[in-house]
Amino acid sequence: MKSPALQPLSMAGLQLMTPASSPMGPFFGLPWQQEAIHDNIYTPRKYQVELLEAALDHNTIVCLNTGSGKTFIAVLLTKELAHQIRGDLNPHAKRTVFLVNSANQVAQQVSAVRTHSDLKVGEYSDLEVNASWTKERWSQEFTKHQVLIMTCYVALTVLKNGYLSLSDINLLVFDECHLAILDHPYREIMKLCESCPSCPRILGLTASILNGKCDPEELEEKIQKLERILRSDAETATDLVVLDRYTSQPCEIVVDCGPFTDRSGLYERLLMELEAALDFINDCNVAVHSKERDSTLISKQILSDCRAVLVVLGPWCADKVAGMMVRELQKYIKHEQEELHRKFLLFTDTLLRKIHALCEEYFSPASLDLKYVTPKVMKLLEILRKYKPYERQQFESVEWYNNRNQDNYVSWSDSEDDDDDEEIEEKEKPETNFPSPFTNILCGIIFVERRYTAVVLNRLIKEAGKQDPELAYISSNFITGHGIGKNQPRSKQMEAEFRKQEEVLRKFRAHETNLLIATSVVEEGVDIPKCNLVVRFDLPTEYRSYVQSKGRARAPISNYVMLADTDKIKSFEEDLKTYKAIEKILRNKCSKSADGAEADVHAGVDDEDAFPPYVLRPDDGGPRVTINTAIGHINRYCARLPSDPFTHLAPKCRTRELPDGTFYSTLYLPINSPLRASIVGPPMDSVRLAERVVALICCEKLHKIGELDEHLMPVGKETVKYEEELDLHDEEETSVPGRPGSTKRRQCYPKAIPECLRESYPKPDQPCYLYVIGMVLTTPLPDELNFRRRKLYPPEDTTRCFGILTAKPIPQIPHFPVYTRSGEVTISIELKKSGFTLSQQMLELITRLHQYIFSHILRLEKPALEFKPTGAESAYCVLPLNVVNDSGTLDIDFKFMEDIEKSEARIGIPSTKYSKETPFVFKLEDYQDAVIIPRYRNFDQPHRFYVADVYTDLTPLSKFPSPEYETFAEYYKTKYNLDLTNLNQPLLDVDHTSSRLNLLTPRHLNQKGKALPLSSAEKRKAKWESLQNKQILVPELCAIHPIPASLWRKAVCLPSILYRLHCLLTAEELRAQTASDAGVGVRSLPVDFRYPNLDFGWKKSIDSKSFISTCNSSLAESDNYCKHSTTVVPEHAAHQGATRPSLENHDQMSVNCKRLPAESPAKLQSEVSTDLTAINGLSYNKNLANGSYDLVNRDFCQGNQLNYFKQEIPVQPTTSYPIQNLYNYENQPKPSNECPLLSNTYLDGNANTSTSDGSPAVSTMPAMMNAVKALKDRMDSEQSPSVGYSSRTLGPNPGLILQALTLSNASDGFNLERLEMLGDSFLKHAITTYLFCTYPDAHEGRLSYMRSKKVSNCNLYRLGKKKGLPSRMVVSIFDPPVNWLPPGYVVNQDKSNSEKWEKDEMTKDCLLANGKLGEACEEEEDLTWRAPKEEAEDEDDFLEYDQEHIQFIDSMLMGSGAFVRKISLSPFSASDSAYEWKMPKKASLGSMPFASGLEDFDYSSWDAMCYLDPSKAVEEDDFVVGFWNPSEENCGVDTGKQSISYDLHTEQCIADKSIADCVEALLGCYLTSCGERAAQLFLCSLGLKVLPVIKRTSREKALDPAQENGSSQQKSLSGSCAAPVGPRSSAGKDLEYGCLKIPPRCMFDHPDAEKTLNHLISGFETFEKKINYRFKNKAYLLQAFTHASYHYNTITDCYQRLEFLGDAILDYLITKHLYEDPRQHSPGVLTDLRSALVNNTIFASLAVKYDYHKYFKAVSPELFHVIDDFVKFQLEKNEMQGMDSELRRSEEDEEKEEDIEVPKAMGDIFESLAGAIYMDSGMSLEVVWQVYYPMMQPLIEKFSANVPRSPVRELLEMEPETAKFSPAERTYDGKVRVTVEVVGKGKFKGVGRSYRIAKSAAARRALRSLKANQPQVPNS
């Protein structure tokens, strides 16, 4: 041992080698360079691994410090030799015997062998029983079992009687083999061995070779004797010699501190006092009965502690400790009941106070006086001064500080491609809270004996730091190991203590503190960094304590200083000699003695010549590897290979001596390195040279195969070799902030216009096409939804309808539905005639009528739009058609158009005057199909009504429904001063003409096709059947509009029809484009073919049962369930878009005779009734009261707007009604942050799909089906209407493509989410398979990197953008008045400035066009306002706007100078004007959101406000689809004030990520329609290579169907041979795509490969039977189970590549299975199910259930233990657990819930086996699924019935506002702890190996506690 200093050093000569003084340069060996890579020796492997090697090699006695490693070595050795023991006894196979000392140890061993292997184990522990067995009985046992575990007594009997001969045993394991030294059966058994010719391999295990103090000679003798008896070599584990026998040994220094001279005499005096007191207490003869506490105990303890501090540290410290103890004593004294005890405590208290007083005479306790400390302390301070840091400015670079290989680096993410920005905020910046590491070169521990010494020494050092600038750098802390031991139960206060200790350790690990003062507890087991200074303040008393504290000094340059008092030094030197001798003996027993290497370290310099270096580019002094640096290169290379947290891969070097005395080495790299062959070096003179040369040769080979780069460093995963895959694109130059591909980055794109509608305006005398828009009522509105008992008007009943006149043909598209008040109407676009021409004059008439429809009937014209048919991009005519003469054929109805032109009521109100002389005459037929206009009000924008019914039994003289007026006539006279001329005319019941122009989805269903809860259907029916709520008009006061009601009803459908037509044509165009680019489908469809209708996959009608049960079923299953399900939102001054903002008196009779409900709040009654005229007053009151009362009553379920019904309030406020009051009751639904039950992170409309425990609702409500599910089924069975074609050959249905282009924000009846998920998993599968087959030698890290680059959102976004998808996508809700450009119109540039959203000026928060609330805004308010409407409308006469419609549409706005519109993506901008409203966080009933200057609000602004967002003000039974899905719209605060200016009619703003989603959805769409081969071709055409390219010439071969089938993996799914293979596009590309080939070899060329293979997979037949699949090529099977640490497998790779493949395959198969589930899960449920089923926990649990772990091949001690725990846990639980990567151990253990860790390796082999089967079966997904489906089916069923959610997500949904997760903290044993605080409800902690595991453990505890305290929440 060349330890520099064993001799005592005098004070002067204390020479420490600190990093600062090191010749290696200042940074060498700083403690935070945690894992130093060794340069002169190979990275050592774990000692258990070394021991296992030794045991495989020869008979071995393993000496370990603990029991844990023993099992590992024994079990692994058994497994390695298992091929010798399978099969029948005797001729073929042997048996393995484990001997234990006592019966109770048998079971323990048995379970270990059974857990980790599939061997049959027999246990024999009972001598009585076993002794009586006959030979036959035994031989049966031996036949049955392969491993026999018996107590030594049983074994002795068996062997002595010859039941089993030693030659039949292949391995004999002796547990506790040290017993063999004594007279013990072990000895007898070994005697038998002497006579046996073929003796078994022997493994002895012992943990107790060293106990307490022992003499080196004895020890040596003991070991030698044991070796003799067991005929083995002893091998010690490195935990007995210094822990890493390879790291440079610390420099050991014994410092003689010199005697303590007590000049002041204070020391003597204090000592005297304390000793006198102790003597007194000891003399007190207090009788102690055995049961009682000793009254003097505490006093003795305190005084002796105090005395010890005085002696060791000196008077200053004694004073400090006395002060501390006095405080402690007060507590005891206060609680002490018993007189005697109390007296002793008081005595002690007095004494301590006396000591303090004595000290005060000598020094002021405030400052540290070094006269009063012991020499030991002085010495310590002197040592610490040597570690003073250098000046900071020399080193500014911090980059390697937080290096990823550190032990204490917390990896934040477990997944390979984290595109989600989920946990960014969790990352702590380590540099923030403490000085840069370079100010910190110390990382030290001072070991002391007593707790108090630690505490006071810490105080002293802190104090010294304040006074001595040289010590100011120290930041110290102490740890006293209170209950730090792993498993003892802990009390509450210990818990607190424990937390504190952990915090101390955390800081020390993070190098926030640089000095730890610790009691011996830290010697073992606690995870702390490598220190460069260890000081033993008290000398070590036994070998173990010496080694363990020395073992803490592991930094490359470190000092181990032992401080000794002069009087102790002699005896300690003796001890130290003993320790050294023991260490030496043990070291020699170490399987690889490192002494040899150390001896010649210094000779290394002249090795250079021994072997020439490997130099690149010799001319310019290029990079080189020399014989001295080669080993370092190899170590570094191995460290970079992919591995799991348990395995640190290291090279293995074997050196053998040749007969001539030279040595040669063989180097084996870890098995996942592409360089597989072992490398044999040339013979050299010394071991050291042999090892170095072989490394040098290896470097050369690695460089040649591209594993080392141009600088001879390991190539990263980003390696150049695979450049072509990464296809590194130039990042587009955009000014748009945000990361490309993320949700945060949004850009504008023009909306696409299908080619066939572009500039297709008919020209005079040019041939035209006339299409008829066919409308048929296919599903009439069911009675229970027809609350007003309205008559239904089937459109087909009247012949006059609309047509489209265009100059270009329109391709065939599927029929599609629109939903009118009468029910579902199917729309078809049929060609009526073509090739005819029209004259200029006719066209002008048609054009005028076209404009009339859009501007007057639909009132869509507004200042920003201008009718310019010649200049418009999308231009065609809409015109009326009718049956001409009697021919029964439709044609253009010119006569009708001319009549309209002549009509007086065409635009305004005709001025008919009736008088007494010419009274009004009522003609019934005029009113049968009429639209009427009241003539006495709203002159500029008159209201139009349908006549619903003629009440012939009523006349103007009938009784008026409200007491204020006698009759109707009186009402008109009084209110409008109108006289009627005909008092016998009947009255008219009227309905508003519809202003709901978005008819794409039905009103009674939400998007998922779920019925909306119709709160009080019964009540409402009654209401509509009575007269009260009807609107009644007098015919004489109305004019009849020239457009009949039947045609008007059809006109209302036009915007929806044209919009849907437009979208479907865009989709059809995309289908055709893909057909030419990818060769999937045909370019133009056959003439006679039409795709099946677009439908949403919903049930058509809803049976009344389910309706009546709505309250309990559909709500019961919805997440945001509220007890009072009447979600009434008061709808007040409802008004129709374009009406004049004058508040005149209105007269619609909305009569309501009910009194105010008693329970409504009193203030409502008073305020409301004051200003309302009586009639309106009543019904207003009723509605307000109800509505508001409802709001008062409970938390509003704001969260899923889908559940709002517009409430029908046909009432107008009168002029005098103050707007503020209205606003008080307006009370918007509260912002979502108050919704107690539903998180706003999840408002994506799945909020009300079933997550209940399988509530019956699932079956009764029509679940959201894939929009085209029905269609897909038809396609699959190929029974499409035109027989002979199918979407498999033609390409997908445009309806399905449209689904893939529709974001959930568009609030349509379908969206891309389901397809996206399917596409996502297929994409992963396709790319994975391609990479796997194309790069047979790339390891998993690289494959994974390439995959994540290819599937990243950023890449997909780029490809989607190139393909032109953004323009075709449907991103926002269809809202004709706001964002639809009618055909023939253009956006008028001059006037549209107010229409444009201006750049750079920010108002409140228009949430970008897609109208969804972004994650960032979630926290803010709901950002919606509702303005009172000026006139009540019937239920759907109500414009629905989404956020983006914060556009003001009316012309009046121009006049009133409305608001300048500005858009900012930041939800909080400074409110500087009255118009930038901010909603209060909590809008309570009385609060006024618009308190700012409401008085001067001019009314046209109200008008404007009505456009803001009525969709929140929903009337009662109308359906508004508008919900927000935060995942799409992230207008985050963090985007900075990015503002985007764009025009809503022609442009759309889309987040990059949505484009990526759309690419995935299209892939899903091609996959479901055309099969897998087509989907692969589609990907290739996008530019994602997933198939190999073959050049034109070899095309014929590629078409050979046999080969083809290789890749059409699921033949049932992909009839890919039918699909044309390559693109036969006009572009004539030379690319053709072939099929992937299975990589040729899975086994390496190796002389005995077959034999080795059979050895290695012996026993796997049972496994093959179990999974029911026989491998054709067994090498795949072996590879699937080989872990990277298993270096015995030299013939295949490890499982990582197969795992990479299998992971993607299982993900795809499971996703596909879920997608095709007839239950048609909604996207949210699909996502949850997928993450519940495709995750490590589930895979690992299944792997254990199917015994995968027994065949697992790994050599990794930690992994062994984790698997062990997990398997035991699984067996106890024996039941699969839901989501999340951990399973809970016990519910009770509330203190510290540590979830059981799921070994990732188990999940990995579950996946890798799938990959192996896939490869072995010739790439057949079907075969994989046949093996895996049976294993997974029970879980799939279980979860589908009751979808699990991850605890983290569930918690965030339960407590969206209040749950906050802390950053990760490290616990003392190196795990991670996360705390989640639920504000107001407590803090919950979770612990686990990774951040994610800990986070979900914490969430799970929080949930448990919350659920326990909230029984009232159903469905939790």
Curated annotation (Swiss-Prot):
Record's keyword terms, sorted: ATP-binding, Cytoplasm, Endonuclease, Helicase, Hydrolase, Magnesium, Manganese, Metal-binding, Nuclease, Nucleotide-binding, Phosphoprotein, Repeat, RNA-binding, RNA-mediated gene silencing
Biased composition (Acidic residues): 414-425
BP GO terms, sorted: angiogenesis; branching morphogenesis of an epithelial tube; cardiac muscle cell development; cardiac neural crest cell development involved in outflow tract morphogenesis; cartilage development; cell population proliferation; cerebral cortex development; defense response to virus
Region described as Required for interaction with PRKRA and TARBP2: spans on this chain: 256-595
Subcellular location: Cytoplasm
UniProt motif (DECH box) ranges: 175-178
Tissues/organs with expression: Isoform 1 is expressed in a wide variety of tissues. Isoform 2 is specifically expressed in oocytes during their growth (at protein level).
InterPro entries: Dicer_dimer_sf, Dicer_dimerisation_dom, DICER_DSRM, Dicer_PBD, Dicer_platform, dsRBD_dom, Helicase/UvrB_N, Helicase_ATP-bd
Domain Helicase C-terminal: 433-602
Modified residues (Phosphoserine): 413, 415, 1016, 1160, 1456, 1464, 1466, 1862
Cofactor requirement: Mg(2+); Mn(2+)
Catalytic activity: Endonucleolytic cleavage to 5'-phosphomonoester
Cellular-component GO terms for this entry: cytoplasm; cytosol; glutamatergic synapse; perinuclear region of cytoplasm; postsynaptic density, intracellular component; RISC complex; RISC-loading complex
One Pfam match: ResIII
Principal localisation: cytoplasm
The record's free-text note on cofactor binding: Binds 2 magnesium or manganese ions per subunit.
Domain PAZ: 895-1042
Family: Belongs to the helicase family. Dicer subfamily.
Assembly information from the UniProt record: Component of the RISC loading complex (RLC), or micro-RNA (miRNA) loading complex (miRLC), which is composed of DICER1, AGO2 and TARBP2; DICER1 and TARBP2 are required to process precursor miRNAs (pre-miRNAs) to mature miRNAs and then load them onto AGO2. Note that the trimeric RLC/miRLC is also referred to as RISC. Interacts with DHX9, AGO1, PIWIL1 and PRKRA. Interacts with AGO2, TARBP2, EIF6, MOV10 and RPL7A (60S ribosome subunit); they form a large RNA-induced silencing complex (RISC). Interacts with BCDIN3D.
Function as written in the Swiss-Prot or TrEMBL entry: Double-stranded RNA (dsRNA) endoribonuclease playing a central role in short dsRNA-mediated post-transcriptional gene silencing. Cleaves naturally occurring long dsRNAs and short hairpin pre-microRNAs (miRNA) into fragments of twenty-one to twenty-three nucleotides with 3' overhang of two nucleotides, producing respectively short interfering RNAs (siRNA) and mature microRNAs. SiRNAs and miRNAs serve as guide to direct the RNA-induced silencing complex (RISC) to complementary RNAs to degrade them or prevent their translation.
Protein name: Endoribonuclease Dicer
